[in-house]
Amino acid sequence: TGIQSVGQIAGVSTINIPGCPIHPDWVVGTIAQLLAGESPSLDEDGRPKAYFGKKIHDRCPRKEEDKAKTFGIEGQCLKEVGCKGPKTKADCYSRYWNSGTNWCIGANALCIGCTENGFPDKFSPFYDREDHDD
C-alpha cells in the first residue's frame, strides 16, 4: 500500500507508543523522561521498555487458573478462546484504565493485542482459539 512510518518519511528515530486506547501514563511518562534529558530504553519495536517490557500473560492473575473453553466463566484463563496476552507486551495488568478502574482481563474480556505490531490485522479475528508457545 505504500504506507510508511513517520520515522521512515522523516529519516529520524521515533518512540512508538501503541495501544487502543493508548494509556495517558505511557505518553506523559515518556515525555517527562525526555524533558528531563533522559532517553527511554526501547525494545526492538521502538517502545519504552518501562511500559512494554513484559508479556501480559506472564503477570496475568488468571495464568495458573483453569483454561476457559467458552466466554462468560469468571476467573478462568482466556488463552484457549483467543486471548492475545501470551504474545502481547504491555503493563495493563498493573496500570488499569479509567483512573485505575479496570483492564481488559479484569473485565472478563480477552486481551486483543492492541500494543503489538500489526494490530489489528495481525491479531484478527479477536475471538478465535490460537496456539501459544507457553
Language-model region placement:
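Terminal, contiguous helix-loop blocks that mediate binding/assembly
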Residues: A50-D134
